Amino acid sequence: MKIAIDAMGGDKAPSAIIEGAVHAAREFGSNIILVGKREVISSELKKHDVKNLPLSIRHASEIIEMHESPSVALRKKRDSSIKVGIELVKRGEADAFVSAGNTGAVMAASTLILRTLKGIDRPAIAVQLPTTSGPVILIDAGANVDCKPHQLFQFGIMGHVFAKYVIGRDNPRVGILNNGEEEDKGNEITKEVHKVLKKSTLNFIGNVEGKELYKGAADVVVSDGFVGNITLKVSESLADMIGKALKGIFTKNWRSKLGYLLIKPYLESFKKSVDYSEYGGAPLLGVNGICIIAHGSSSPKAIKNAIRQAGEFVKGRVNIHIQEDIERNIKIQPSEVKKGGVLRALKEIVSFSGKKETGKEATTEDTEVSESIK
């Protein structure tokens, strides 16, 4: 198995990325292709003992920075580490791609180069949120701001496959993130998706309220990317606030410090359960290849686990199972599937990233990127 990793992407690149890759190669035995500027990567590798480790370098002369517009950068930087890495997957020279770089660029390049799986209209980001009974998958966490019923239906199938074949849930419970448990709650789109999922082969449990998300009420929670991303960001902010509050409490005086020492093992266990670095990254599901999007500020540990996760997706044959489940449910799938899905998906990515070249219509820009990236 070969995993390509964007050595130049992320706030802590290249040092944290390469250190994480070295740990992954040593611990998992994965063949890792470090994509980026050869001289920079070689210099970083000298800081580690890499003798006999399955590491190789694929040169890419350009870097897409975190602040750049995905569409503009992909059009102008044709030898970027993101584009080169994804092309390795396209050509079968790598089984998966991992990047902590510009999320919008990774999504756009994956969609345009790898294309979507048969039966999938839009790719979606799936994140794992911690609960008292193990992680729950939230899909979509930001790839698609506006969604149609058939797209949310497809997200449910992709989340089901993730939960079953990667996390190991025997019969994953799938729910819709909604403002009430009752079947008639929600907007017109969620009501329509509810009807279709109810008829599907999935273990559909109905609507899931926000208050039930962290109680483990479902294994997979379906949402559009707008609501999903807000949910994710609120969760991250809340976790940060709780951490700071606890730190303030336990450093207040000698009694609180003593109390901390008594419960430290339990706090460490809790911290580990909510630490994103333990999960590694978030898969971009629905594209014809395995792509893991890591957090921009990923530590070496997070990168190591993102590489591990990429391997799990390859071994789990996730894309094959997604297509099989789409085929099983094709007769009940909402019929509103239109042509031009790739360009519409790119338009969503540009909108989501908030970085767009001025003076051009979105459709013109999308077409230019689609043609130039090939």
Regions found by a protein language model. Give the residues of each.
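Glycine-rich phosphate/diphosphate-binding loop of Rossmann-like nucleotide-binding domains
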Residues: 15-16, 28-33, 38-42, 145-210
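N-terminal glycine-rich anion-binding loop in soluble enzyme alpha/beta folds
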Residues: 17-66
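Glycine-rich phosphate-binding loop
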Residues: 88-107, 185, 190-192, 196, ...
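Glycine-rich phosphate/nucleotide-binding loop
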Residues: 111-124, 130-138, 220-221, 225-332
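Phosphate/nucleotide-donor binding subsite
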Residues: 50-94
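Short, low-complexity, charge-dense intrinsically disordered segments
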Residues: 363-374
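Phosphate-binding loop/pocket of nucleotide- and phosphate-handling active sites
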Residues: 314-317, 321-360
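Short, glycine-rich nucleotide/cofactor-binding loops
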Residues: 3-15, 143-153, 293-300
